[in-house]
Amino acid sequence: MTKVRKAIIPAAGLGTRFLPATKALAKEMLPIVDKPTIQFIVEEALKSGIEEILVVTGKAKRSIEDHFDSNFELEYNLQAKGKNELLKLVDETTAINLHFIRQSHPRGLGDAVLQAKAFVGNEPFVVMLGDDLMDITNASAKPLTKQLMEDYDKTHASTIAVMKVPHEDVSSYGVIAPQGKAVKGLYSVDTFVEKPQPEDAPSDLAIIGRYLLTPEIFDILERQTPGAGNEVQLTDAIDTLNKTQRVFAREFKGNRYDVGDKFGFMKTSIDYALEHPQVKEDLKNYIIKLGKALEKSKVPTHSK
């Protein structure tokens, strides 16, 4: 059996929800306190045992490459001033086996994954989406990517991460139609449906941003016609793959943080900061103070 060694991180999106900040800065470089969102993804991959990572980028994404490259001037300056802890943080982002390829035009997630065909070769691989951060406030939690890799060791089949979402939100996700109940958190799947309307959704089990796929997916993606949004949808290709070989779904029970919109990004930043040793106490005190002020502002005033 071939070991899962490689991961793909699609990062070619335009990040329009975060304009004007993302006009010249990659959305994936927006920080949660002091760490870019893409670094959380890379760290999850490494903790899971991934050996090589390909980042699929687009225009205005050079900052991602720079972040994971050496910065001699900065490193020399930190070393000269004896700032060894900061130097260690910088070194952690450069000692990684990262590759980059550019998607010329954003044609959907399926097309972004297809750019990695030569990199992956004939091996199983993981796709990790940057909008979904998993268990970032729980250092002891088993990474979701690692869970998928362990499933593959047992089934030798593609496995997609899913999570229950409110029924009214299913139209924002790919959704699975499970075959019966899960066995130790693993579902057999009848069909995969991209962004169904709530009345048409086969379940509330939504696909979240972790996929373990066999290389046969590339042949399907090459023939895949555009789907929802006139883009090449990875969910559609997975549904086709499921017709010729088993595809399972792993239900995630941890904490998922959606940093793909402003409010989700803010919530993630607050939760992470409340566990950050340098700011958590000050932030807790500020939130308590702010909460009291907000409660006070709700008290109606009466003129005499």
From Swiss-Prot:
Pathway: Carbohydrate metabolism; nucleotide-sugar metabolism
Keywords, comma-separated and alphabetical: Nucleotidyltransferase, Transferase
UniProt-listed Enzyme Commission number(s): 2.7.7.9
BP term (GO), one: UDP-alpha-D-glucose metabolic process
InterPro entries in UniProt: GalU_uridylyltTrfase_bac/arc (IPR005771), NTP_transferase_dom (IPR005835), Nucleotide-diphossugar_trans (IPR029044)
Name of a matching Pfam family: NTP_transferase
Protein name: UTP--glucose-1-phosphate uridylyltransferase
Organism encoding this protein: Streptococcus pyogenes
Gene name in the database record: hasC
